[in-house]
Amino acid sequence: NMACDAGYDLVIPYTNVNLTDVKGLVQDAIFSRSIKDAKRTGIFICGKDASLALDMMDLAKKSMVPPFEISVFPDPAGSFTTAAAMVACTEKTLKEKFKTDLKNKNVVIYGGKGIVGGISAIMCAKYGSKCTIVGYDGIENVSKKADEYKNRFEVNISPADG
């Protein structure tokens, strides 16, 4: 629906796509059009799993053969754009009201195991915040998520059980 609202001429949804499908879909999109038209083609990766969406993006980029390249944008469940908006609003408020930013701030994100909270924590940690994500189903589960973020995004995020 966002692509339609943005004025795209054609939107073709694919459902139940997995990693093994990505290369074929990307190459079908790039090789079935001229180079000029391929540049006007984009793949929007949705779903509900941020790690899988990023894996799909990485594979999509590796599947391209220059100069046949297209845009690829992952935003599973709208989480990346929602997290970016949340962090941007927080930064704006800190700047306007307190003349500061997120660097070296202690940031606690409740629901941090969820997709939006997790991406927000990653963004804040990348900016230099000291982040804690709070989960509600035991310290083991939230610790696994914090470790996943550390391994994939090279950020230090502390787990806490709420």
Residue ranges of predicted features:
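General beta-strand structural signal in soluble alpha/beta enzymes
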Residues: 45, 71-76, 159
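Glycine-rich phosphate/diphosphate-binding loop of Rossmann-like nucleotide-binding domains
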Residues: 92-162
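Extended hydrophobic secondary-structure segments that form protein cores and membrane-embedded regions
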Residues: 43, 75-76, 106-111
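A glycine-rich, Thr/Ser-enriched phosphate-binding loop motif common to dinucleotide/cofactor-binding enzymes
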Residues: 74-92
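Gly/Ser/Thr-rich loops at beta-strand to alpha-helix junctions
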Residues: 48-53, 78-82, 112-117, 138-140
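Short, surface-exposed connector motifs at secondary-structure boundaries
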Residues: 37-40, 69, 125-132
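Glycine/charged-rich beta-loop-alpha catalytic/anionic-binding loops adjacent to active sites
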Residues: 65-73, 103
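N-terminal ligand-binding/catalytic initiation module
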Residues: 1-68
